Amino acid sequence: MTGAVTIIGGGLAGCEAAWQIAGRGVRVVLREMKPQRYSPAHHLSGLAELVCSNSLRGESLENAVGLLKEELRRAGSLIMAAADATRVPAGGALAVDRELFSSYVTERIEGHPLIELVREEVTELPAEGVLVIASGPLTSDALAERLKQITGDSLYFYDAIAPIVAADSLDSDKVFRASRYGKGDGDDYLNCPLSEEEYERFVDAVLAAEKVPARDFEKVVHFEGCMPVEEMAERGRETLRFGPLKPVGLTDPRTGREPHAVVQLRAENREGTLFNLVGFQTKLTWPEQRRVFRMIPGLESAEFVRLGSMHRNTFINAPTLLEPTFRLKGDPRTFFAGQITGVEGYVESAGSGFLAGINSARLVRGEDPAVPPPVTALGALVAHITTAPARHFQPMNVNYGLFPPLEGKVKKKDRRGRLAERALAELDHWLATV
């Protein structure tokens, strides 16, 4: 294919994609609706606006997001250059001055000779040319209607995220494997049994826990079929026990009896290193989630690799729709990038923009698509987003539970360092080819 690549959306992913495409000698038309029109959450006229926190999270390679940052730095990321140039003191985290950050990105985009910035709302998808859709979690209604034409029923408007825990942080003396009534393979779920006393204490804690207040543009949301656990508890003390915590069809091998209540954990990935709390979508604050959910037997020392949330979020079912290159299956000219792909987080969005950018440029240049090695942070995230079980797909941030295991025995305290070391070595080899 020839000509310019059109990018819809001037957020982190769209700007990163534009930078990578232009850096490979391909023209870009970047279309951003601000300041002609603002979403309910945006206020700055500049590009790459950080809507929520000004933190890009941890810097250490002990955190997978810290590793992803380092990978993007090595890959020549515009977003990471902007973050490093506009950082503010934040301990072990990378936080930025959000206005300076936006200005930095805007100036670089506007100053690049191969990038044309068009500030107007997109309501129709271009019929020709390579396209990167990076319209973000607050995609306008008009554009969302057009996206339905290419995504069908696989376009969602709200997420309902349950917490995810690392399997190796669970207490195996308390948790048992079983499926309700022995269905499936008979041991598909991990089960945390609660006595009546433990259940009552848990309900009390849920009812008393602090909740995240809804933002103005989220207050009309009705979560059909995925009510927050705290709202279920408010309906009555037994509601949870007849809902997600129902014990029927399960026998605690320690007692030989049906527990009073059971919290079920379902595998989040094929390797079985991550498990989500089934039915535990919630709007409790993150500190309260850690405190309250660690009251569940077996989860006392649980490592939460993702905490629960429920908010406005336009995203597609990536396992159904996307190739590992972030190209749309069945439509070789269209790519997706950013939170609309189901990645969660600023850095993850930039990473997806990087990959969609280099692959759309490679398409224009007649080159084969590139997929990062699965042992890298970017590769592990891409592999999860595009191969996770489609039926239960929800947005995901990068975490070490997504990575392929190391070969041989490695002490737990050394594991993350070794994963990071392996990732960066493989990344350097891969970058030399793209």
UniProtKB/Swiss-Prot annotation:
E.C. no: 2.1.1.74
Key word Methyltransferase present: yes
Top enzyme category: transferase
Record: residues binding FAD: 9-14
Biological process (GO), any one: tRNA wobble uridine modification
A GO term, aspect molecular function: flavin adenine dinucleotide binding
Cofactor: FAD
Catalytic activity: uridine(54) in tRNA + (6R)-5,10-methylene-5,6,7,8-tetrahydrofolate + NADH + H(+) = 5-methyluridine(54) in tRNA + (6S)-5,6,7,8-tetrahydrofolate + NAD(+); uridine(54) in tRNA + (6R)-5,10-methylene-5,6,7,8-tetrahydrofolate + NADPH + H(+) = 5-methyluridine(54) in tRNA + (6S)-5,6,7,8-tetrahydrofolate + NADP(+)
Locations listed in the record: Cytoplasm
GO cellular component: cytosol
Presence of keyword Transferase: yes
Keywords of the record: Cytoplasm, FAD, Flavoprotein, Methyltransferase, NAD, NADP, Transferase, tRNA processing
Gene3D superfamilies to which the protein is assigned, alphabetical: FAD/NAD(P)-binding domain
Function summary: Catalyzes the folate-dependent formation of 5-methyl-uridine at position 54 (M-5-U54) in all tRNAs.
Family (UniProt): Belongs to the MnmG family. TrmFO subfamily.
Identification of the protein by name: Methylenetetrahydrofolate--tRNA-(uracil-5-)-methyltransferase TrmFO
The encoding gene: trmFO
